[in-house]
């Protein structure tokens, strides 16, 4: 619902979408529609900003019983944020995290056709709170959804909730327009 609304407010209809991704080719978070970056990869679009700040999560994300260090699945795959691996390698998408204490999961990881390296679990967990506890709903979440129901503009609502971050991104857009960024 939210993505459709966001895209519609930017003149993109769902029926015209053949491909959608939330990471650009340099592995930064950035909305892509039909293999085109929605925004310059150095500039964060409002949809991605709202998602990464936990504003647009579903209600169950704020009370997820699986958001803890103790894993119940055979394997958990995620980003390698906070690990000892080179930032450039992580940025290029050459690394991901897999957590597993289960025999099946360990076998699966060991049989992957890539180089596998152990990292400090505590460091990685400290950079990805979902591995410790559920996301916390932002203070303005209810306001955001109340206004969305009234068909208010997505971008303006995000700017109202996160003015400093949005101003910074808007300055980048202006600088890019004048070839200063």
Where are the model-predicted features located?
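Long, compositionally biased charged/polar accessory segments in the mid-to-C-terminal portions
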Residues: 15-181
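Contiguous mid-protein beta-loop-alpha structural module that forms a pocket-lining wall or clamp
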Residues: 1-16, 20
